[in-house]
């Protein structure tokens, strides 16, 4: 029995080390040892039965029964010790086998957990890499940090307090802004209209000033119809004619004062009519003036140049022939 226990211990050490043989060979050795120990236990039972029969016969046949009793006691004690030892060896073998199996199970569980952990780590790395790649491709929707709301129109009034009041205030602010923008646009248009009106007014005033500067009393009485025509022509041209003869003309012609006053009244009335027509026309054409100002300027300059040329070619009126 002691040899069996020693051999089993050696087998257990070999299983723990696994240095000399493979796992299958060790398992075969363990099964053989276990079967041998079970056979020894069966043989022990038969030996005990045979010993009991022998002592029974000896006790009945021998005269010295005391000696037979002592031998029986010694044999029974030895047999009991051997059986206990044998049963202890078997229990040790069984417990060692169970412990080995549990150790193997623990080792396999540890290996499985390590493999599972490695798989989780690799999956996490793959997920991070995939997220980093997808984040460069997908354009995430942008919302305000404090107001990330679900879809739908009914979510806004429930999420924001006093939503109706805020909406009314927003509409009022938009209306006020529209009113202010319209007022600013009207002021800008008025500012743009003022220089154009002043231009037309200056152009319209130029003939009246020229007519006032040229007095009809300096002209001879025989040519009353001619000065009116010239005055009309001069009222159409914006550049006043300043000739030394008109300035140096003599003033002592009293009989023609009434005629000159009537001519002046007619000129003033015609000038007022022209000014009124010019102002109404300027008010109508203010919107189109920004586009037509360069063309009008060119035409105006051409007309001025042509009139100056025509006036240079005309003969100067001689006022000294009457004297």
UniProtKB/Swiss-Prot annotation:
Residues 281-294 have a biased composition (Basic and acidic residues). One of its GO terms (cellular component) is cytoplasm. Residues 295-310 have a biased composition (Basic residues). Keywords: Cytoplasm, Cytoskeleton. Residues 204-222 have a biased composition (Low complexity). InterPro entries: ABI (IPR028457). It comes from the Eukaryota. It is found in: Cytoplasm, Cytoskeleton. Its main location: cytoplasm. Residues 243-268 have a biased composition (Polar residues). Binds SCAR. Belongs to the ABI family. Involved in regulation of actin and microtubule organization. Part of a WAVE complex that activates the Arp2/3 complex. This is Putative protein ABIL2. It comes from Oryza sativa subsp. japonica. The lineage of its organism: Eukaryota, Viridiplantae, Streptophyta, Embryophyta, Tracheophyta.
């Amino acid at each position: 029995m002691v040899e069996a226990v020693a051999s089993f211990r050696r087998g257990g050490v070999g299983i723990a080390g696994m240095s000399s043989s493979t796992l299958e060979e060790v398992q075969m050795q363990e099964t053989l040892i276990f079967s041998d120990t079970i056979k020894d236990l069966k043989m022990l039972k038969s030996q005990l039965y045979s010993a009991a029969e022998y002592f029974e016969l000896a006790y009945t046949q021998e005269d010295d029964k005391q000696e037979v009793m002592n031998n029986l006691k010694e044999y029974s004690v030895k047999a009991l010790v051997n059986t206990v030892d044998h049963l202890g060896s078997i229990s040790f073998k069984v417990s060692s086998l169970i412990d080995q199996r549990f150790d193997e199970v623990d080792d396999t569980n540890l290996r499985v957990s390590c493999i599972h952990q490695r798989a989780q780590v690799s999956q996490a790395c793959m997920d991070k890499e995939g997220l980093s790649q997808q984040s460069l491709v997908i354009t995430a929707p942008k919302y305000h940090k404090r107001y990330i709301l679900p879809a739908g129109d009914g979510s806004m009034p429930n999420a924001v307090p006093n939503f109706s009041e805020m909406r009314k205030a927003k509409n009022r602010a938009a209306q006020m802004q529209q009113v202010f923008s319209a007022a600013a646009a009207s002021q800008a248009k008025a500012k743009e209209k003022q220089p154009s009106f002043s231009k037309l007014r200056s152009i319209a005033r130029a003939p009246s000033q020229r007519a006032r500067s040229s007095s009809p009393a300096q002209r001879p009485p025989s040519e009353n119809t001619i000065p009116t025509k010239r005055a009309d022509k001069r009222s159409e041209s914006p550049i006043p004619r300043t000739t030394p003869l008109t300035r140096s003309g003599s003033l002592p012609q009293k009989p023609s004062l009434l005629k000159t006053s009537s001519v002046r009244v007619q000129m003033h009335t015609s000038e007022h009519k022209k000014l009124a027509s010019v102002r109404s026309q300027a008010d109508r054409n203010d919107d189109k003036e920004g586009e037509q100002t360069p063309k009008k300027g060119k035409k105006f300059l051409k007309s001025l140049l042509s009139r100056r040329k025509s006036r240079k070619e005309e003969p100067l009126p001689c006022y000294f022939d009457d004297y």
